């Protein structure tokens, strides 16, 4: 068994904020002495049906606690989702319907078990205690925090000073999230850096109810495949945990070498020593960056799919890109799903040819390939089914990855 100090070092690896060492060591020592695991909580509002790698950063840290033998609760904020988290927002968020929340919650629960051990994970819903509160109990909860304290939040302050409306329900959001920690008797709560204020409210709410305050741990925001912006579906720089192995592999191979190390730190269990060793191996020529990136891609696919699919994705990537001499970085071109589209028309649409006749000549001349295989029929029809993707090459230097939405 790891000592309290060893556990603390592993827990803190890769974190953005940790509050605080002294409290955590006390909790860990008591846990070992009493043989009672700590209560660890991560909450998420089911505001969208699927999660991407950026969301998994904090789930990976939850898995660390699970591996250390602590009790893990994944809280689905079905009540708070109806309010809408105002964190980082400059306007009031629209509230979701109960049906949307329930469907998204089921999807979340299924996806987190690609990382967490389902036998050691408790799924809880905050409506199960908040909806049972009497009006008097709810008012008592709101009395534990002041408007002045809530206005310490930067986004609330900006909106207040600019005259932008703030709904009363938005003030209630951090209070109800904080009360979740009271209900679950949480020892440690995890979240992204954008959740720090809400997590600290939970710490304060526990103290107000006469409980030992939870420790707070936040994880950094993960950069998307562009290496610049936060991973986001709206910026189309994300990898979803439900992406195909082929897409996961291809997208991972497009990231920069420096971002590769960042992803190793936040998305794998390599640890501090392992990460330092990887950097040294590349710097001293023992490993090529491309090899290290392949290992990362295979790790991700193994986690969200299987070892066999990880190997198959590498083999397919090598067949298309390495053996055929295609570059690792091929730009995406999105097209709407259709029953079929002529190859020549698709080439024009993707700006690989100026006209159908030019595309036809390229095809007949053997200058067009789909996933590394030559095509010769200028009248060929391509099935464009949603979710499909393939690399289209025209001539010697024009490449595009067709992604069907």
From Swiss-Prot:
Keywords annotated in UniProt: Aminoacyl-tRNA synthetase, ATP-binding, Cytoplasm, Ligase, Nucleotide-binding, Protein biosynthesis, RNA-binding
One Gene Ontology molecular-function label: tyrosine-tRNA ligase activity
Subcellular location(s) per record: Cytoplasm
Highest taxon above the source species: Bacteria
Gene3D superfamilies: HUPs, RNA-binding S4 domain, Tyrosyl-Transfer RNA Synthetase
GO BP: any one term: tyrosyl-tRNA aminoacylation
Residues where ATP binds: 233
Residues of the S4 RNA-binding domain: 341-404
GO CC, alphabetical: cytosol
Catalysed reactions listed for this entry: tRNA(Tyr) + L-tyrosine + ATP = L-tyrosyl-tRNA(Tyr) + AMP + diphosphate + H(+)
Principal place of residence: cytoplasm
Pfam families: SYY_C-terminal (PF22421), tRNA-synt_1b (PF00579)
Cited InterPro entries: aa-tRNA-synth_Ic, Rossmann-like_a/b/a_fold, S4_RNA-bd, S4_RNA-bd_sf, SYY-like_C, Tyr-tRNA-ligase, Tyr-tRNA-ligase_bac-type, Tyr-tRNA-ligase_bac_2
Motif position, 'HIGH' region: 46-55
EC number per UniProt: 6.1.1.1
Motif ('KMSKS' region): 230-234
Function according to Swiss-Prot or TrEMBL: Catalyzes the attachment of tyrosine to tRNA(Tyr) in a two-step reaction: tyrosine is first activated by ATP to form Tyr-AMP and then transferred to the acceptor end of tRNA(Tyr).
Family: Belongs to the class-I aminoacyl-tRNA synthetase family. TyrS type 2 subfamily.
Record protein name field: Tyrosine--tRNA ligase
Organism whose genome encodes this protein: Bdellovibrio bacteriovorus (strain ATCC 15356 / DSM 50701 / NCIMB 9529 / HD100)
Recorded name of the encoding gene: tyrS
């Amino acid at each position: 068994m790891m000592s309290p100090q060893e556990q603390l070092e592993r827990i803190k690896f890769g974190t953005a904020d940790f509050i605080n060492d002294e409290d955590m060591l006390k909790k860990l020592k008591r846990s070992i002495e009493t043989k009672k695991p700590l209560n660890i909580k991560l909450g998420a509002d089911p505001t969208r049906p699927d999660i991407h790698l950026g969301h998994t950063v904090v789930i990976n840290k939850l898995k660390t606690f699970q591996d250390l033998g602590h009790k893990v609760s994944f809280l689905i904020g079905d009540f708070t989702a109806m309010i809408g988290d105002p964190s980082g927002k400059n306007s009031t968020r629209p509230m979701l319907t109960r049906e949307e929340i329930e469907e998204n919650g089921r999807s979340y629960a299924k996806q987190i078990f690609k990382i967490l051990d389902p036998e050691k994970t408790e799924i809880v819903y905050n409506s199960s205690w908040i909806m049972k509160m009497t009006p008097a109990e709810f008012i008592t909860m709101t009395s534990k925090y002041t408007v002045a304290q809530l206005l310490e939040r930067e986004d609330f302050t900006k909106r207040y000073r600019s005259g932008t409306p703030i709904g009363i329900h938005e003030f209630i959001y951090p209070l109800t999230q904080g009360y979740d920690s009271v209900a679950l008797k949480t020892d440690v709560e995890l979240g992204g850096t954008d959740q720090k204020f809400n997590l600290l409210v939970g710490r304060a709410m526990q103290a107000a109810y006469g409980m030992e305050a939870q420790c707070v741990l936040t994880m950094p925001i993960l950069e998307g495949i562009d290496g610049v912006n936060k991973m986001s579906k709206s910026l189309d720089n994300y990898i979803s945990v439900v992406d195909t192995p082929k897409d996961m592999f291809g997208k991972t191979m497009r990231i920069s070498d420096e971002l590769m190390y960042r992803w190793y730190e936040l998305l794998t269990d390599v640890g501090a020593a392992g990460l330092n060793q990887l950097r040294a191996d590349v710097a001293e020529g023992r490993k090529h960056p491309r090899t290290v990136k392949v290992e990362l891609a295979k790790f991700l696919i193994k986690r969200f799919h299987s070892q066999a699919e990880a190997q198959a994705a590498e083999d397919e990537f090598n067949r298309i890109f390495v053996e055929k001499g295609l570059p690792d970085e091929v730009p995406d071109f999105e097209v709407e799903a259709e029953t079929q589209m002529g190859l020549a028309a698709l080439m024009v649409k993707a700006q690989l040819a100026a006209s159908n006749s030019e595309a036809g000549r390229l095809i007949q001349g053997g200058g067009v390939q789909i996933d590394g295989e030559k095509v010769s029929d200028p009248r060929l029809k391509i099935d464009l089914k949603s979710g499909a993707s393939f690399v289209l090459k025209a001539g010697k230097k024009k490449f595009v990855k067709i992604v069907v939405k």
